[in-house]
């Protein structure tokens, strides 16, 4: 299964590389954090089978959850099995935030 580091994702963002960034944190965790990685689109991890076919296939998709473990890795594996270039963010949102990378307030 493919993964991407915090530094690599920051480089991709700085280079304006084309990719889809999906926040797949559980609703309660996401709302408690009240922030997200800029450019991310939230998808409910509990509903993956209702939205998986809507993920663009023409570019890499990067997924992040709270810590970069079960949720993002499981969904990345599902998308990869469908033929998508799917990667999970190592250390997830907590690693991104701890590294001092930019975040934005959740859109209301």
Label every model-predicted segment.
Residues 1-20, 24-62, 67-108:
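Rhodanese-like catalytic fold shared by cysteine-dependent sulfurtransferases
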